[in-house]
């Protein structure tokens, strides 16, 4: 098969949701259909604890939440599918936002009993800003939930996106009978031996069933007053196709997968800093690092840089140009993933995600190119932390492990590091409290370095220009520090001290990040 055909087979997407909406379960079921796992929640051929395949880090297994984005790949119906499972916990929005820069579409999982929740809304905004297609899966129909019409209305009002139901529930919870498939014009049956039935048979199958009658009434209303189906609007991210189902009982998931692959886009181009768009079908390889993960295999203390291939083909052993340093790097130890299992990869194409073994060469946001055409992709968003803690090594003899751990976890983007300009003290910045807990856990378990962490509370962070730097401006209410790139930054105690500083030094430009 030629390169263009291979690239056109790729479908790369992320799954987003609020915690506990069933994101990991639906990921499992998709892998099951892809033949990657024998049954959801278990790994093919491994006698291990019955943990979800996509939650691989120790702390995730203990808590049942995804705190890192895992990457999984499978083949299905002539397509090569790359799923990026994103952290559902709001404290990890930073990692999630960066992951959303590496996909061509998003699947939003919604709990039918709870509707649109805070975290879903936040992630949706990022996806919408990118203008990529969004597919909605309303989950947990095996339990009692809210009225389907209410859920659609909320989707449109809260998220501001038009919706089109691809199927419609017949009952819910104990009364759940199945789905009326509007798109394929058939019934999908929840009970009994037959999976599908024709619409004509529905009246006989569900004679005198009030839930079937209600479903037909709802559908009639939607046909008259609802949105029209438009593939063009889906691809622009203006219309979300809505699927109902139950990931836990694996009902409606395959129908969703078939439709998703029919409408989801093939890999798209990415913008460079000089506003050019790199076409996926360009023969020259290019890609960017969207995530760095240390210790995916605790036995080897390794680090993996996750690269989204934007154009061309990767071949094992090829040399690439690292735009940030201008140096040439050989890509020889490269893997592809199935959560914790991985295999060496000989070649991969635009749309694929590869893991490059990293000895400290890469940073999140790095651009890799080949050939004479040198450029950099648009920078990935960075987020200003709000919570801060001072951190130091508990055992002075473990300074080496302490510094190595901090350096690796900071490069991974799991936490942000600031150094007090005057005292040299380390200060950690996070978007949410859980990031500190994960940092402490990983320092102790992966680097054998116990840490002392002292809360500093909330801070307002502003960067200043190097030429404006004057240590005399620093005080207990506005601490002068350096970020991990040695750029000067002030940590203000609150908005009052920020405004006081701005009034006192009107010529100093204070810069805010995302």
UniProtKB/Swiss-Prot annotation:
Domain of life: Bacteria
CDD domains: RF3 (cd04169), RF3_III (cd16259)
Major subcellular location class: cytoplasm
Keywords linked to the UniProt accession: Cytoplasm, GTP-binding, Nucleotide-binding, Protein biosynthesis
One Pfam family cited in the UniProt record for this chain: GTP_EFTU
Alphabetical list of SUPFAM superfamilies matching this protein: EF-G C-terminal domain-like, P-loop containing nucleoside triphosphate hydrolases, Translation proteins
Residue span(s) of domain tr-type G: 8-268
Location of the protein in the cell: Cytoplasm
Residue positions binding GTP: 17-24, 85-89, 139-142
Matches recorded under InterPro entries: EF-G-like_DII, EFG_III/V, G_TR_CS, P-loop_NTPase, PrfC, RF3_C, RF3_dom_3_sf, RF3_GTP-bd
GO MF, any single term: translation release factor activity, codon specific
Keyword GTP-binding on entry: yes
Annotated GO CC locations: cytosol
Family annotation (PROSITE patterns): G_TR_1 (PS00301), G_TR_2 (PS51722)
GO BP terms, alphabetized: regulation of translational termination
NCBIfam families tied to this protein: prfC, PRK00741.1, small_GTP
Entry's family note: Belongs to the TRAFAC class translation factor GTPase superfamily. Classic translation factor GTPase family. PrfC subfamily.
Role summary: Increases the formation of ribosomal termination complexes and stimulates activities of RF-1 and RF-2. It binds guanine nucleotides and has strong preference for UGA stop codons. It may interact directly with the ribosome. The stimulation of RF-1 and RF-2 is significantly reduced by GTP and GDP, but not by GMP.
Protein name, per record: Peptide chain release factor 3
Lineage of the species this protein comes from: Bacteria, Bacillati, Bacillota, Bacilli, Lactobacillales
Gene (UniProt): prfC
């Amino acid at each position: 098969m030629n390169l263009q055909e291979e690239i056109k087979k790729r479908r790369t997407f992320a799954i987003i949701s609020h915690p506990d909406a069933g994101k990991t379960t639906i990921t499992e079921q998709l892998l099951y259909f892809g033949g990657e796992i024998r049954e959801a929640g278990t790994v093919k051929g491994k006698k291990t604890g019955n943990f979800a395949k996509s939650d691989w880090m120790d702390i995730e297994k203990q808590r049942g939440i995804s705190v890192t984005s895992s990457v999984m790949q499978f083949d299905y119906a002539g397509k090569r599918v790359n799923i990026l499972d994103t952290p559902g916990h709001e404290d990890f929005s930073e990692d999630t936002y960066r992951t959303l820069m590496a996909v061509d579409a998003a699947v939003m999982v919604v709990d039918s009993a709870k509707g649109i929740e805070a975290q879903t809304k936040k992630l949706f905004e990022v996806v919408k800003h990118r203008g990529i297609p969004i597919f909605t899966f309303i989950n947990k129909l095996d339990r009692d939930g809210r009225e389907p019409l209410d859920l659609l209305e909320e989707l449109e009002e809260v998220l501001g996106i038009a919706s089109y139901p691809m199927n419609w529930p017949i009952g819910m919870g104990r009364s759940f009978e199945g789905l009326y498939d509007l798109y394929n014009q058939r019934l999908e049956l929840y009970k009994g031996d037959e999976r599908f039935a024709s619409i004509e048979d529905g009246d006989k199958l569900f004679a005198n069933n009030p839930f079937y009658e209600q479903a037909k009434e709802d559908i009639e209303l939607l046909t008259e007053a609802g949105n029209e189906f438009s593939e063009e609007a889906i691809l622009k991210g203006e219309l979300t196709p809505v699927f109902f189902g139950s990931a836990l009982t694996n009902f409606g998931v395959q129908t969703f997968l078939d439709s998703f692959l029919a409408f989801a886009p093939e890999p798209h181009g990415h913008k460079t800093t000089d506003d050019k768009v790199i076409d996926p079908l360009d023969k020259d390889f290019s890609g960017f690092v969207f995530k760095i993960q240390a210790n995916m295999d605790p036995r080897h203390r390794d680090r993996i840089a996750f690269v989204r291939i934007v154009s061309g083909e990767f071949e094992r052993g090829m040399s690439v140009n690292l735009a940030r340093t201008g140096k040439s790097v050989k890509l020889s130890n490269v893997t592809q993933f199935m959560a914790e299992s991985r295999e060496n990869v000989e070649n991969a194409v635009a749309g694929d995600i590869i893991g490059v073994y990293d000895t400290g060469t890469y940073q999140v946001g790095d651009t890799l190119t080949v050939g004479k055409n040198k450029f950099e992709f648009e920078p990935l968003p960075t987020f200003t932390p709000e919570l801060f803690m001072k951190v130091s090594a508990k055992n002075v003899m473990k300074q080496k492990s302490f510094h190595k751990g901090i350096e690796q976890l900071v490069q991974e983007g799991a936490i942000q590091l600031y150094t007090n300009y005057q005292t040299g003290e380390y200060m950690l910045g996070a978007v949410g409290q859980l990031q500190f807990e994960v940092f402490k856990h990983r320092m102790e378990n992966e680097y054998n370095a116990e840490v002392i962490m002292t809360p500093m509370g909330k801070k307002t962070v502003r960067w200043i220009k190097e030429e404006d730097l004057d240590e005399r401006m620093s005080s207990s209410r506005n601490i002068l520090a350096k970020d991990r790139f040695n750029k000067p930054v002030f940590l203000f105690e609150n908005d009052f001290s920020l405004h006081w500083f701005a009034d006192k030094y009107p010529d100093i430009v204070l810069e805010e990040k995302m």
